[in-house]
Amino acid sequence: MSASPKGFRFATVSAGFRKEARPDLALIVSDTPATAAGVFTTNRFQAAPVVVARENLSARPVARAVVINSGQANACTGDEGMTNCRTTLDLVGKACGIPAAEVLPASTGVIGAQLHMDKWREAAPRLAAALGQNTHHDFARAIMTTDAFPKVAERELAIAGTTVRLVGMAKGAGMICPNMATMLSVVLCDAAVTPEAWQRLFLDAVDRTFNRVTVDGDTSTNDTVFGLANGASGVTVEGEDLAKLGEALTDVLARLAYMLVQDGEGATKVMRVKVSGAVDDAEAEAVARTVGHSQLVKTAMYGRDANWGRIVAAVGRSGASFKAEDVVVTLCGVELFRNGQPTDLDFDTLLREPLKGRDVTVDIELGAGTGHYELLASDLTHDYVNCNADYRS
């Protein structure tokens, strides 16, 4: 386990936002102003904290704190929700001695539920007093909703002979189909980076990781990824070292993205859909997403069924351009389909053991060009239905 990046403190408390008594309010404070980046949901119904966080970052890409509550999403809550969100930043800022404009909010929970402001007023001073008593692992645990486990990824790298640390924390198990679903993540770094470079690195890393996962095809109103870089290591990243930092950032987000799919509500499989030979990358993405979203493919994977017909049918309705006879479908290294028909391999026997594992790879070659795309998707189980049927109760 790596140490946390320098210059960040963590706090979690139980504010009573959830039915069960457990930490449900989490705070990160940087000892010094940090360069801040953000990537947000593309859902047209954007939660109040998304709107407010965008405003704060647009005004000035600097932050001292991130505060996240679990229990109420504060989405579709009208003017009252916006006012409440800004009030929470005032409360946290006052308790911590930080300008409210330098506090970034995020919320997760039931859509349409107003924040419990009386509980916020009582909890904010306790939260500030607890700073330094918790770890980034505690933070990840406090922001969970239907998650089965906290999601943390750490990375160290050497720049200019000095160790730079990154840590990422995320939550999400359902409503995951980001296009930066609910998916929240915070990444901390103790290097100094210019706002322009940090945001650019963030956008690229999110596009290559979080935007390439799906659990159920639903995109949340609250999707948020924050990144804070405070320079506490004494290292300024610039020039050629930016690519090195970008690779480390992408690695952290990629591991978090895998955990999000691994922890998809009720999931037993992580399906890696790899499409190649498309006319272009956009068509490869269309194929990967159609296969990854297919309920028939997902349930086949859950049932350990080498049902190539469901995969081929999904490929065929993706809208991509190709000749049917050029398509090759391979599952866990076993070729199932070629020349417009199934192969003569005994793939049910060959795949009996591989399909018992958690990781499943679906390779689809279209033979139409050089476009390629890769997507992570979960399977679909009885537990997913049970979890979401009972979510509000």
From Swiss-Prot:
Keywords: Acyltransferase, Amino-acid biosynthesis, Arginine biosynthesis, Autocatalytic cleavage, Cytoplasm, Multifunctional enzyme, Transferase. Belongs to the ArgJ family. The lineage of its organism: Bacteria, Pseudomonadati, Thermodesulfobacteriota, Desulfovibrionia, Desulfovibrionales. It is found in: Cytoplasm. It catalyses: N(2)-acetyl-L-ornithine + L-glutamate = N-acetyl-L-glutamate + L-ornithine; L-glutamate + acetyl-CoA = N-acetyl-L-glutamate + CoA + H(+). Substrate binds at T145, K171, T182, E265, N388, S393. GO terms for cellular component: cytoplasm. The record marks T108, G109 as: Involved in the stabilization of negative charge on the oxyanion by the formation of the oxyanion hole. Its main location: cytoplasm. Its EC number is 2.3.1.35, 2.3.1.1. GO terms for molecular function: glutamate N-acetyltransferase activity; L-glutamate N-acetyltransferase activity. HAMAP family: ArgJ. Pathway: Amino-acid biosynthesis; L-arginine biosynthesis; L-ornithine and N-acetyl-L-glutamate from L-glutamate and N(2)-acetyl-L-ornithine (cyclic): step 1/1; Amino-acid biosynthesis; L-arginine biosynthesis; N(2)-acetyl-L-ornithine from L-glutamate: step 1/4. InterPro entries: Arg_biosynth_ArgJ, ArgJ-like_dom_sf, ArgJ_beta_C. It comes from Nitratidesulfovibrio vulgaris (strain ATCC 29579 / DSM 644 / CCUG 34227 / NCIMB 8303 / VKM B-1760 / Hildenborough) (Desulfovibrio vulgaris). Catalyzes two activities which are involved in the cyclic version of arginine biosynthesis: the synthesis of N-acetylglutamate from glutamate and acetyl-CoA as the acetyl donor, and of ornithine by transacetylation between N(2)-acetylornithine and glutamate. This is Arginine biosynthesis bifunctional protein ArgJ. The active site is at T182. One of its GO terms (biological process) is L-arginine biosynthetic process. The record marks A181, T182 as: Cleavage.
